[in-house]
A protein has these predicted regions:
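Short hydrophobic core segments
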Residues: 8, 201-211
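Core beta-strand elements of the Rossmann-like FAD/NAD(P) dinucleotide-binding domain
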Residues: 3, 196-205
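Flavin (primarily FAD) binding-site architecture
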Residues: 208-222
């Protein structure tokens, strides 16, 4: 069988394209060398946030992220959950306080697009009622809403929905070579990493959704994907420290999140250029990076110095290349690269850049390009309206609590 499209990479972008393409009637093969969402997707801060910090230098990314985060919430209510945040304000910085409130006022319209509440300004007493451990020099706080997500299930359910629409899934299968007819890419050769079997799959279009590995995959065809990979680490604590997140400030001014997530708390992230092997980035977490994050937490909550980290982990962002820009200020915009026009290699597309909150839009745009390259007429995407598996009919938890002797909130947590 010759597939319409073979996709290399089962992170959220690859799985999203597989779902969109399959739902628009294309035959799809999806390859992932590990398990769904095992790379950059799984190493994220696990929020479909609106890109608040990008508002300073990349307003279009904030807009599209906020709009598509609302769609992700709509199609995956069982995977997403509200995280109310506090942004501590410190003594001696009155102008900074006013600037931050003006900044959140500008962000409010984007927050509302994804279902968040308007920000509020709290006194020190009000802030300490919510988080009693705040440092003595905290004179107040600002509030805002973001949304957490189970990233591994999000990637897996996109792949599952693609399969229900007819896609073939190949987890734990590494693409080791591209197949050619002349200069045209015509498929992939893959190796099953569980049993060692090597097999070939032909396709009319091959999509490189390899994330930070995209440059290496494109190089198999003599093509080029220019990225500026960024390393980000997180520290996880073994308990849920509170029900509110905190927006922290690193010693270099970088925004850092302390995020309650299930029974754990996540602290992150850093942002540094990285040109090593993305598969080994977990082995390159340094004591200085961990200390940097812990110091940011201790600035807001002195007791954080006594918290016991459970683990530290890292990932690599596949950010688009920019020269002369600090890693923290790199754009999170995305591009679909057509290597026929860029490198004279027909049959190969690459996905570059992007962020978790706008994966669905990225997949829609990529599928539009695939349809055009295949000579098919345009077909509308339904991925922003069709619920992911398991989200079709959320139960009435209040009514269910009358039958099961548990609080509605507990039942909702079990359902999620």
């Amino acid at each position: 069988m010759v597939f319409d499209v073979a996709i290399i990479g089962g992170g959220i972008n690859g799985a999203g394209v597989a779902r969109d393409a399959a739902l628009r009637g294309l035959s799809v093969a999806l390859f992932e060398r590990e398990d769904w969402g095992a790379g950059t997707t799984g190493a994220s801060t696990r929020m479909v946030h609106g890109g608040m910090r990008y508002l300073l230098y990349d307003v279009p990314t904030t807009r599209t992220s906020s709009e598509d985060a609302a769609r992700v919430r709509r199609i995956a209510p069982h995977l997403t959950f509200r995280i109310p945040f506090l942004w501590p304000l410190y003594a001696g910085r009155p102008l900074f306080h006013e600037a931050m409130e003006a900044f959140l006022s500008a962000y409010d319209p984007y927050a509302r697009r994804k279902g968040g509440l308007r920000h509020a300004r709290l006194t020190a007493e009000q802030a300490r009622r919510i988080e009693p451990g705040l440092a003595p020099d905290v004179t107040g706080a600002l509030t805002l809403d973001e949304w957490g997500v189970d990233v591994h299930r999000l990637a897996a359910l996109n792949a599952l929905d693609a399969r229900e629409a007819g896609a073939r899934l190949f987890p734990h299968c590494e693409v080791v070579e591209l197949l050619f007819s002349g200069r045209t890419v015509r498929g992939v050769r893959a190796r099953d990493r569980l049993d060692g079997r090597v097999f070939e799959v032909e396709a009319r279009i091959v999509v490189n959704a390899g994330g930070p590995w995209a440059g290496r995959i494109a190089a198999m065809a003599g093509a080029r994907v220019q990225l500026r990979p960024g390393k980000g680490i997180h520290v996880t604590f073994e308990r849920r420290i509170g029900n509110h997140g905190l927006i922290l400030e690193g010693v270099d001014g970088r925004t850092i999140f302390l995020v309650p997530h299930g029974a754990e708390t996540i602290l992150g992230t850093t942002d540094d250029d990285f040109y090593g092997d993305p598969a080994r980035v977990d082995y390159e977490v340094t004591r200085d990076e961990i200390a940097y994050l812990l110091e940011a937490a201790a600035r807001a909550i002195p007791q954080a110095r006594t918290w016991r980290p459970l683990r530290a982990w890292a990932g690599v962002r596949n950010t688009l290349f920019e020269w002369g820009v600090h890693a923290d200020a790199l754009s999170r915009r995305h591009e679909v690269l057509d290597h026929e026009t860029r490198d004279g290699v027909p049959g190969l597309l690459s996905l570059a850049g992007g962020k978790l909150a706008s994966y669905r839009l990225f997949a829609e745009e990529a599928t539009d390009v695939i349809l055009e390259k295949l000579g098919h007429p345009p077909r509308p995407s339904i991925t922003g309206e069709r619920p992911l598996p398991g989200a079709e009919a959320p139960p009435d938890f209040v009514r269910l609590a009358r039958e099961i002797p548990l609080p509605p909130a507990t039942l909702e947590r079990i359902w999620r």
